[in-house]
Amino acid sequence: MYKNYNINQLVLPLNLEIKIQDNDIARHVNNLVESIPKKAFDKYYKETGCPAYHPRMMLKILLCAYSQSIFSGRKIEALLSDSIRMMWLAQGYSPSYRTINRFRSNKEMQELLCQCFIQFRAQLIKEKIINNEAIFIDGTKIEANANKFSFVWKKAVEKYGISLIENSRRIYDELVEQEIIPAMELEQEATINEKEMVEVVEKLDSAIEVMDKEIAESDSVEKRKRIRHKRKRPKQLRKILKDNIARKQKYDRQLAIMENRNSYSKTDPDATFMRMKEDYMKNGQLKPGYNVQIATEGQYALAYDLFPNPTDTRTLKPFLDVIESSYFALPEYIVADAGYGSEENYVDIIENRQLTPLITYGMYLKEQERRYKKDAFKTANWDYDNADDYYTCPNGKRLIFKYNSQRKDKNGFARNFRVYECEDCCNCPYRSQCCKAKEGNNRKISINVKWEQQKEYIRAQLSDKKTGKIYKRRKIDVEPVFGFLKANLRFNRFTVRGKFKAKIEMGLALMAVNLRKYMQHTAVV
């Protein structure tokens, strides 16, 4: 006996909503997008032209597709014909893949995604899933949609640029020495700039034209032969100079694209070459990618941004600015790992924002070890006399204050140091263990007072029962979001190019992670 099956018979229900379960991902997508205020969609509205697909519908089908690990515009278009979820959300409409891709990369899409995150966070707070006490920040690297061999390195461009200028200067000196062109007033005696190179080519053109005219007017075979021989070298040099000018312009364009970065990809100029965690060949190969920063609570991504620099330290300040300006007011506690611990970041959070950083620094775990605490040659373990301002080394010698110094990093942040020097390191039995200075020189130490105070403050915060408990949640709060994104959602590489489009796609992927997590939560409840 078989169940009744007839392909030619009308099947009920015609209303697809009946087929969608109450806790289905499509319903959560629908509820989230419907909660976004109508004002957020006003920029899409146009009085003229063919009526457009409603942006609410387009956003719903994108979020639903991303939640099912479908990122391609063509595959999303196919889902609109195959998936009951997508048919219900689209209400029978079937936008083409071109329409889907154009909507995904629309200039208004970023603001719309911000509204998604804001509404989703408000819902979590309302349902008391999160308490807005702290945010947990971390970053991961996602590979860009670019060829891994399309690299341009800043050092190489600068090296070839210098070589090109030197070569052009030698050509100029040769032309002047042979009296082919007259000497020029250069801005700098030892070098030559692009404008001056163009002027040299113009003078060289004039000199070659004169030679051409002499050849045309001369009746003597020997004279014409002599002039042609004389003209040969200037023509070669002119060709080299023209090539140098074109290359100089290319190098300038490349440096302008690079800005403060050390590399970029020709396929996606916004992407920077960095080491990925997914290094299957174990050879440290650099790939073009973006540094994705997220802020989470309760394992939900509440804000995000993309950065071109591979290190997390320089991303914290601009990321906190983005959170405040586009998402929500910062809570009392900012929690992150040691990759974000720096004097500049501590100053920004404690002094400028008046908040509490629960961020370890590079040597924090090392300093907790018994071996480190018992090491007599670590300056952190040396006795300090606050009244007379000196340190005492393991040999009982005093290190007296000598002078103040200031160091600036490449970002322009200034750090102040107090330099102390030992009275006498000669004949010290511990010299080989304590001092790396040359024989005859005394041991010097540089103490950053502000940095030491900040480290003491962080140690106190992490030792406190309440704040220490909050910091311990970091690993189980922010890391699972990346695990879900890469392992479950299988989002390991962008499908679009350019930072603007990549940021939109990252927002769609993170919101898809949030919705799937929220679906699991509501199913348990």
What are the functions of these language-model segments?
Residues M86-Q91:
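Secretory-pathway/luminal and periplasmic proteins that interact with or process carbohydrate-rich
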Residues D22-L63:
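Basic, short loop/linker segments at the boundary and entry of helix-turn-helix/winged-helix-like folds
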Residues M1-R27:
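Hydrophobic alpha-helical membrane-insertion signals
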Residues Y2-N4, L62, S69-D82, Y93-S94, ...:
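Anion-binding and metal-coordination hotspots
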Residues Q21, G49-M57, Q68, S72, ...:
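Generic, well-ordered alpha-helical segments
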